[in-house]
Amino acid sequence: MPAPHGLSPLSKAFLMRRAFQRRILPHSLAMALSLPLAGYVQAQEVEFDIPPQALGSALQEFGRQADIQVLYRPEEVRNKRSSAIKGKLEPNQAITELLRGTGASVDFQGNAITISVAEAADSSVDLGATMITSNQLGTITEDSGSYTPGTIATATRLVLTPRETPQSITVVTRQNMDDFGLNNIDDVMRHTPGITVSAYDTDRNNYYARGFSINNFQYDGIPSTARNVGYSAGNTLSDMAIYDRVEVLKGATGLLTGAGSLGATINLIRKKPTHEFKGHVELGAGSWDNYRSELDVSGPLTESGNVRGRAVAAYQDKHSFMDHYERKTSVYYGILEFDLNPDTMLTVGADYQDNDPKGSGWSGSFPLFDSQGNRNDVSRSFNNGAKWSSWEQYTRTVFANLEHNFANGWVGKVQLDHKINGYHAPLGAIMGDWPAPDNSAKIVAQKYTGETKSNSLDIYLTGPFQFLGREHELVVGTSASFSHWEGKSYWNLRNYDNTTDDFINWDGDIGKPDWGTPSQYIDDKTRQLGSYMTARFNVTDDLNLFLGGRVVDYRVTGLNPTIRESGRFIPYVGAVYDLNDTYSVYASYTDIFMPQDSWYRDSSNKLLEPDEGQNYEIGIKGEYLDGRLNTSLAYFEIHEENRAEEDALYNSKPTNPAITYAYKGIKAKTKGYEAEISGELAPGWQVQAGYTHKIIRDDSGKKVSTWEPQDQLSLYTSYKFKGALDKLTVGGGARWQGKSWQMVYNNPRSRWEKFSQEDYWLVDLMARYQITDKLSASVNVNNVFDKTYYTNIGFYTSASYGDPRNLMFSTRWDF
């Protein structure tokens, strides 16, 4: 039916929404627009296809597809998410389904509908368990088609939009991962603006943000035990098949994590069961015999839908551009949701992940110097590892959550998590200053085995409260985590021939040693207890003030001397001021601390004081198109104390009776700025891009963390065509980083040498074609121009190359 007065339904909805928001819409005008079409809303069936998304954008799309005027106040639907509707429905049925679980009601007036949301204190709307789950972790990104999130809760445990959050945060959504084939956490981090991925070797990567290694991981908001980067033990191997999105909160995050890194926290949000039956099968094949398969099935398990489940399995078998290296990974995931009553939901689940490599490189992929101190020049395919070398790692997790919706908008949640991270690593690789003049070389062979068992508990309450005539929000909670790391190391080998005669043509063929008895034992127990609180005070309609803090007790006991921090207080202060309906300015302050690893000892053999620092941040954020597009610009400073640095003066002495190698704690300061944009630029056009600049200097003014580039740029985008090409989606992106360098000690020549990685671009492309409604085919091309670059220089005087050009073809069937 044509729109009266020559206005499209979307234009009418926009104009009437503005009038409605300002309360100046005359009743006669509303009647004049709606009377010619009275009764239409309830009368005709319409073909709908609206995926879950921000409620404001869903209402606009509903108005367009139904040719109906939709009136609503933007502030009432902000932070809410629609349900999906698909198929032939009467508009009144469709809008009811669209609004399910939002707390919104609809009033029909001919061909116009008015959406309203009751005040929380007076609402009798049934807040179902699905809504609670979604809101407490933020909005689900799966099936949204978006590169930006709706709401997030990583920063303060309060559920906020990116614009309302007084810290920088980047979210890599499910759509972004699917478009660019981001199948593991390493891939996701490489696409995350402001993050540097440094490869220690074939199976260990480290992530950096704002000049600091990231050791803070969360799973559904539950902090995991801070990982030991040297052993990795699973965190950096997470397969993305089981996750809805990855949230990266930049800067100090002590409010919810307690002890941890100053750089960032990575929060992996698991996929949840759906109310409708759905699933997919995906198969892929790519460069270097890279094969991957994935199965995902979800839906209700009872007729009423009060029990829902989801199962995911993925398997990958891949070789590499590196000689004699291959890796098999497998992941299995299951989750169940039980609606115990209309206000209470129980969630239980488990996941199982294995990483089984062969031919693992160790401490880089090739040595930088030969025995004469000359720089080695080897091909990208060179692999220093023996064929039997394997850094096998695994993760086992079981978890349970209980959520209850109390009266007046309050929600309580109890979360339990049990995790086992393990490794079994018989390792052999050419390490040191090789080859000799006769082209011979020696390998270093050692074995590491171990397992960390951890248990985490988090309990919190959140909800609104009244103070001085205004409504505010509060979160109060407590958490506890316990972990036990047991390990063995083997390196005292006897009668082992570790020599190869041909370094240049090394193919990994060498005998495996008899490991004998352990040379070292690890038996560390870590306990962290904490209580936290955050309040969001609505000081005025435009100003929100955040006040909070955490009290931490942290203790490590074991074979090394006990490390303890008791009653440590971590403050959190933030403010957000709305300049208008689009832009907000913000400022925040918080800090964090992390006890030093046991080998960071001073010249008196005393463990260094905990690394600690304060994070200051100011910025401006923008929100466009009802939250479908978000922007941010931030300036930050991090003031660090007790950064571990080599004590060069002490270590240069010929004899050191107290300790052979000493460190000292120094002060350092990071200054930088970030700009980011994510979301929908226009219908069908998604983007995520960011630029980061930072400089880290110690208290003498010298630059530190120079291997992490000062400048980084990331841009990824996709476009779904309309009209005759509406089955085609194309996309691409690029990552650029400025020059970085590392000082490496040349032992044969007894001097330090500077190794640099010049600035470089990496370009990726993707395309997807929707063959049928259920079947699609995709291709991803990474490093299109086959750029040669290093992902690490200097780790044990070695280096590692990044991946050359590679392709991946995949096909997906949805059901």
Curated annotation (Swiss-Prot):
One of its GO terms (cellular component) is membrane. GO terms for molecular function: siderophore uptake transmembrane transporter activity; signaling receptor activity. InterPro entries: Plug_dom (IPR012910), Plug_dom_sf (IPR037066), Secretin/TonB_short_N (IPR011662), TonB-dep_rcpt-like (IPR039426), TonB-dep_rcpt_b-brl (IPR000531), TonB_rcpt_b-brl_sf (IPR036942), TonB_rcpt_CS (IPR010917), TonB_sidphr_rcpt (IPR010105). Residues 1-43 form the signal peptide. Transmembrane segments: none annotated. Keywords: Cell outer membrane, Ion transport, Iron, Iron transport, Membrane, Receptor, Signal, TonB box, Transmembrane, Transmembrane beta strand, Transport. One of its GO terms (biological process) is siderophore-dependent iron import into cell. Induction: By the siderophore, pyoverdine, and under iron starvation conditions. The keyword Zinc-finger does not apply. Residues 276-815 form the TBDR beta-barrel domain. It is found in: Cell outer membrane. A motif (TonB C-terminal box) lies at residues 798-815. NCBIfam families: TonB-siderophor. This is Ferripyoverdine receptor. It comes from Pseudomonas aeruginosa (strain ATCC 15692 / DSM 22644 / CIP 104116 / JCM 14847 / LMG 12228 / 1C / PRS 101 / PAO1). The lineage of its organism: Bacteria, Pseudomonadati, Pseudomonadota, Gammaproteobacteria, Pseudomonadales.
